[in-house]
């Protein structure tokens, strides 16, 4: 006897998420607002593919067998390594380099899309997420960096985040690079250790100085004690080197007095550029409550070469466990003068900012700044008779409603009237259209106000109040279908506006 074939188990891969209609609409609404600010600043839309040659991504080059962890990669028929993009910046650099001669300089563009990280997933940490970037390529001066910070502040306020609930923090990687040079971590041979330092400093808010000091030194067990949890290898700095790094990246640090960096040219250049950015944003009317200079901002990617930015939400909102916490970063960016230059062999200055779309959407929903109250479920035409003539008549009703701009559908399942009304209720449909044999013979139909009907059932117990309420169901001539539905929808909208 043949074995029964096993059913394939339906399961979502770890680190990925399905998206609901509500979330999709919320993201589209939020992104339309962000896009309007980018457009206001004169940026143009652009788009690049999800897949790039791995060497074009720059940070995760293939080894003998496969690319390093961090990206999803595969080989094509020509045995060339391809990877899903891990951000939008590296593909932008490739595009600009490939089309450099025909693009206007400065090239000001924005783009949005999915990016992928082959990293360990966790709560709120996904392997696929959406970013929304803006970039200026071809401008060497820090005026472009100052503009990025100002544009991000304007984005926050356009989304309804009031002053005091956000801040754009600005630093300069040259400050930290100068410190690293001074303590002996300059040069190509120390790229790996520098990246470990950057990622350690990027965790200051989460781990605090002592936790970061372990990552700067021998390493850290994430369980809090030796042998507990996973071990993260440190940068191998000695105590003096680690202290110099922590001193230079303290949130309120000013120009360091320590002689270890006092004469370092890279450090001094970074400090000077920060002073220029601060002067520019203040002259434009952006106070410290909106854009603040902050030495703790480093960003975790190696390719940043100058000013770096981070958009932080200061508002306290519930986390996944219901605890009230400061939400933190929702985006960041900086100057990446070396990315385009890799392809062209000549200096090409560039700066940009990336918004974490999913994270920002979560924050806005928690703050009550994003909802879909203006999205109304469709009017549903119930199917009482299933012969071809009746189906054609129901379809005609739907067509009339759609022609009038009313979102609507004909029920296409196989259930009876009771189940159809239950379907309409689960969809949140505002109105149901009903026409059986008796109504058809009279040229009439019933229009059921599902919102008012639900309210009356839940709230009204007094007969007098019931009679005084708006009718939850009316019978009208077929010719009055559109007018009556519009009337009901308008009444529902008025009640929503009153907060009823």
Swiss-Prot record:
Enzyme class at the top of the EC tree: ligase
Highest rank taxon of the organism: Bacteria
EC number(s) recorded for this UniProt protein: 6.1.1.21
InterPro entries to which the protein is assigned, alphabetical: aa-tRNA-synth_II (IPR006195), aa-tRNA-synth_II/BPL/LPL (IPR045864), Anticodon-bd (IPR004154), Anticodon-bd_dom_sf (IPR036621), His-tRNA-ligase (IPR015807), HisRS-like_core (IPR041715), HisRS/HisZ (IPR004516), HisRS_anticodon (IPR033656)
Transmembrane feature ranges: none
Gene Ontology MF terms in the entry: ATP binding; histidine-tRNA ligase activity
CDD domains membership: HisRS-like_core, HisRS_anticodon
Entry GO CC: cytoplasm
Any Gene Ontology biological process: histidyl-tRNA aminoacylation
Broad class of the protein's primary localization: cytoplasm
Disulfide bonds: none
Subunit (UniProt): Homodimer.
Protein name: Histidine--tRNA ligase
Species, as recorded: Mesorhizobium japonicum (strain LMG 29417 / CECT 9101 / MAFF 303099) (Mesorhizobium loti (strain MAFF 303099))
């Amino acid at each position: 006897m043949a074995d029964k074939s096993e059913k394939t188990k339906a399961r979502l891969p770890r680190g990925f998420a399905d998206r609901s209609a509500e979330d999709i609409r919320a993201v589209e609404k939020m992104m339309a607002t962000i896009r309007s600010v980018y457009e206001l600043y004169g940026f143009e839309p652009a788009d690049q593919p999800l897949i790039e040659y791995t060497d074009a991504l720059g940070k995760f080059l293939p080894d003998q067998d496969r690319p390093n962890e961090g990206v999803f990669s595969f080989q094509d028929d020509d045995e060339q390594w391809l990877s899903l993009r891990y951000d939008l910046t590296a593909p932008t650099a490739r595009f600009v380099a490939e089309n450099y001669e025909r693009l206007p300089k400065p090239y000001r563009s924005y783009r949005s899309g999915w990016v992928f990280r082959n990293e360990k997933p966790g709560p709120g940490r996904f392997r696929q997420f959406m970013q929304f970037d803006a970039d200026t390529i071809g401008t060497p001066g820090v005026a472009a960096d100052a503009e990025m910070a100002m544009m991000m502040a304007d984005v926050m306020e356009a989304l309804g985040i009031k002053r005091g609930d956000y801040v754009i923090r600005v630093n300069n990687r040259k400050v930290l690079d100068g410190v690293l040079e001074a303590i002996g971590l300059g040069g190509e041979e120390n790229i790996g250790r520098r990246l470990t330092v950057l990622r350690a400093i990027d965790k200051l808010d989460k781990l605090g100085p002592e936790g970061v000091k372990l990552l700067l030194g021998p390493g850290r067990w994430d369980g809090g004690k030796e042998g507990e949890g996973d071990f993260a290898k440190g940068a191998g700095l000695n105590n003096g080197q680690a202290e110099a790094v922590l001193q230079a990246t303290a949130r309120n640090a000013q120009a360091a007095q320590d002689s270890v960096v006092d004469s370092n040219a890279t450090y001094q250049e970074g400090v000077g550029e920060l002073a220029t950015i601060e002067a520019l944003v203040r002259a434009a009317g952006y106070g410290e409550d909106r854009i603040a200079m902050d030495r703790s901002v480093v960003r975790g990617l190696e390719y940043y070469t100058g000013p770096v930015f981070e958009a932080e939400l200061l508002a306290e909102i519930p986390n996944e466990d219901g605890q009230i916490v400061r939400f933190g970063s929702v985006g960041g960016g900086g100057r990446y003068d070396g990315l385009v230059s890799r392809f062209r062999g000549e200096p090409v200055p560039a700066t940009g900012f990336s918004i974490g779309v999913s994270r920002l959407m979560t924050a806005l929903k928690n703050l009550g700044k994003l909802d879909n109250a203006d999205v109304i479920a469709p009017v549903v035409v119930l199917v009482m008779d299933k012969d071809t003539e009746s189906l054609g008549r129901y379809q005609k009703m739907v067509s009339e409603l759609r022609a009038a701009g009313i979102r609507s559908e004909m029920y296409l399942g196989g259930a009876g009237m009771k189940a159809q009304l239950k379907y309409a209720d689960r969809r949140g449909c505002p109105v149901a259209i009903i026409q059986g044999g008796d109504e058809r013979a009279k040229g009439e139909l019933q229009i059921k106000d599902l919102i008012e009907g639900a309210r009356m059932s839940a709230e009204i117990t007094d007969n007098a109040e019931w009679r005084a309420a708006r009718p939850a169901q009316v019978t009208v001539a077929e010719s009055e279908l559109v007018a009556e539905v519009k009337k009901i929808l308008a009444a529902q909208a008025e009640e929503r506006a009153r907060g009823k």
